[in-house]
UniProtKB/Swiss-Prot annotation:
It is an enzyme of class 2 (transferase). Binds 1 Fe(2+) ion per subunit. This is tRNA N6-adenosine threonylcarbamoyltransferase. Belongs to the KAE1 / TsaD family. One of its GO terms (cellular component) is cytoplasm. Keywords: Acyltransferase, Cytoplasm, Iron, Metal-binding, Transferase, tRNA processing. GO terms for biological process: tRNA threonylcarbamoyladenosine modification. It is found in: Cytoplasm. It catalyses: L-threonylcarbamoyladenylate + adenosine(37) in tRNA = N(6)-L-threonylcarbamoyladenosine(37) in tRNA + AMP + H(+). Its cofactor is Fe(2+). It comes from the Bacteria.
Length: 337
């Protein structure tokens, strides 16, 4: 089976073609980073309009790169939610229109299921069951995964997501958008031990996260200290260490609770080098293994949507002709495959 996948949930327009026998055939992506940089964050209306401009050329490019015609496509998958509703509707309209005109089945995919399954695009894939740490600008959650669609959310952020905390703290430090990667780059120049940031909610039972207080602590520290480059780097490192330690502590707790030996990390923050190293070291000590997608599949992309959609289309799941974008959509409400 061969599926065209479309991703437009936020500020990346992604289109890909995935074949269940040959793997990923093409992967095209347009990022709106430059468009939103002057505003310090994503402007929903501008994001939607830019998706409209880019989506048709990217669909054509993805098909050409895969050496496909419409006759070679067996189904269409598109991100139905969660995300910015205007942006979602661009991809949903395109996906539904293509499926209808080609007389192919279509399926709306949960954006976070796409991230969760992104490591399946690699050669070394995790076996079920596994624990998934999904960390992005909009979500931070721990999920027990028994199979595709068999999800139990064990914990999630009660306020800011980890990626949001990275971006907001970076903005407080005067770093350009997108701030998370720039803060990590600055932290690489830092010296450990100069500052100690709290590890939120690690002294309490449970697996939920909270990062808003950490952001406030960072703001107060930034305001109280000098603005020289080394001090800024030290603060950035202390912040990054606090986020990574918090995520690692919660992962260890969840692994003990579930008894799982495999850990998946996915979402934009999963590209963070310090987080990957910390979790890899932890899993080695526990006799387990950590899995994550390559860097280009940590952020939003059409490949993960094509893969996730293919699994559901193969199981006979399809959507009706209605065009829907779901801004909020609990992951654990999805049907199993």
């Amino acid at each position: 089976m061969r599926v065209l996948g479309i991703e437009t949930s936020c500020d990346e327009t992604g289109v890909a073609v995935y074949d269940d026998e040959q793997g990923l055939l093409s992967h095209t992506l347009y990022s709106q980073v430059k468009l939103h940089a002057d505003y310090g964050g994503v402007v929903p209306e501008l994001a939607s309009r830019d998706h409209v401009r880019k989506i048709v050329p990217l669909v054509k490019q993805a098909l050409a790169d895969a050496n496909c015609t419409l006759d070679d496509i067996d189904g269409v998958a598109y991100t139905k939610g969660p995300g910015l509703v205007g942006a979602l509707l661009v991809g949903a309209c395109m996906g539904r229109a293509l499926a209808y005109s080609w007389d192919k089945p279509a399926i709306g995919v949960h954006h976070m299921e796409g991230h969760l399954l992104a490591p399946m695009l690699e050669d070394d894939v995790p076996a079920f069951p596994f624990l998934a740490l999904l960390v992005s600008g909009g979500h931070s959650m721990l999920v027990a995964v028994e199979g595709i669609g068999k999800y139990e959310v064990l914990g999630e952020s009660v306020d800011d997501a980890a990626g949001e905390a990275f971006d907001k703290t970076a903005k407080l430090m005067g770093l350009d958008y997108p701030g998370g990667p720039r803060l990590a780059k600055l932290a690489a120049k830092g010296e450990s031990g100069h500052y100690r940031f709290p590890r939120p909610m690690t002294d309490k039972p449970g697996l939920n996260f909270s990062f808003s207080g950490l952001k406030t602590f960072a703001a107060n520290t930034i305001a109280a200290e000098s603005d020289d480059e080394q001090t800024r780097a030290n603060i950035a490192l202390a912040f990054e260490e606090a986020v990574v330690d918090t995520l690692s502590i919660k992962c260890r707790r969840a692994l003990k609770q579930t008894g799982y030996k495999n850990l998946v990390i996915a979402g934009g923050v999963s590209a963070n080098t310090r987080l990957r190293s910390s979790l890899a070291e932890m899993m080695t000590s526990l006799g387990g293994k950590v899995y994550y997608p390559r860097g280009e599949f940590c952020t939003d992309n059409g490949a993960m949507i094509a893969y996730a959609g293919l699994q559901r289309l193969k199981a006979g799941q399809t959507d009706d002709l209605g065009v829907k974008g779901i801004p909020r959509w609990p992951l654990d409400t999805l049907p199993p495959v």
